Amino acid sequence: MTVTFQNNPVSISGSFPKVGDRLPSFTLCGADLNDLSNEDFKGKKIVMSIFPSIDTPVCSKSVKVLQNALMTRNDTVLLCVSADLPFAMSRFCTEHAVANVTNASFFREPAFTERFGVNLNEGALRGLAARAVIVADEFGVITHSELVNEITNEPDYDRILMSL
């Protein structure tokens, strides 16, 4: 499977989850440096926004757009996942007044990108995650999955929100 980065093909590996699948299990590092897993979000809908780094324009914009769109939804968690250290993600949220977001890093578990089918195998971003959004209902069943074809493009916000 491939995506593009600045119109250059980049191979990705792993199995990208599809609508109707169960959300794969995961263990990530939270902002407080403690582990986060599927169990922490039981009974909640999850919008999992996966991206290369919070310090890129498209990644930061997508976090802000999704946070604003989901602000009043008490039944939904916005889980932002990247290789960034928790300190960088916390700094971003403080500097940009981003709240109601759960930041998670896969820096301790690089296998996360394989398990979720977003592992960038080559190019300048090798080892980071491709841009993707996966939405799961309160039972852990995927209701939306989007692997963004061009890493520098934003996800389809309307389809994300319609899947909730």
UniProtKB/Swiss-Prot annotation:
Reactions this protein catalyses: a hydroperoxide + [thioredoxin]-dithiol = an alcohol + [thioredoxin]-disulfide + H2O
Spell out the catalytic residues: 59 (cysteine sulfenic acid (-soh) intermediate)
- Which superkingdom is the protein from? Bacteria
Please state the span of the N-terminal signal peptide per the UniProt entry: none
- The Thioredoxin domain sits at 17-164
Q: Which CDD domains match?
A: PRX_Atyp2cys
Keywords, A to Z? Answer: Antioxidant, Disulfide bond, Oxidoreductase, Peroxidase, Redox-active center
Q: List the disulfide bonds.
A: 59-93
Give EC number(s), comma-separated. 1.11.1.24
InterPro entries in the record, alphabetically?
Redoxin, Thioredoxin-like_sf, Thioredoxin_domain, TPX, Tpx_CS, Tpx_Peroxidase_subfamily
Pfam assignment, any one: Redoxin
Give the quaternary structure: Homodimer.
Function according to Swiss-Prot or TrEMBL: Thiol-specific peroxidase that catalyzes the reduction of hydrogen peroxide and organic hydroperoxides to water and alcohols, respectively. Plays a role in cell protection against oxidative stress by detoxifying peroxides.
Its family remark reads: Belongs to the peroxiredoxin family. Tpx subfamily.
HAMAP family from the entry? Tpx (MF_00269)
Any extra detail in the entry?
The active site is a conserved redox-active cysteine residue, the peroxidatic cysteine (C(P)), which makes the nucleophilic attack on the peroxide substrate. The peroxide oxidizes the C(P)-SH to cysteine sulfenic acid (C(P)-SOH), which then reacts with another cysteine residue, the resolving cysteine (C(R)), to form a disulfide bridge. The disulfide is subsequently reduced by an appropriate electron donor to complete the catalytic cycle. In this atypical 2-Cys peroxiredoxin, C(R) is present in the same subunit to form an intramolecular disulfide.
**Descriptive protein name:** Thiol peroxidase
Q: Which gene encodes it?
A: tpx
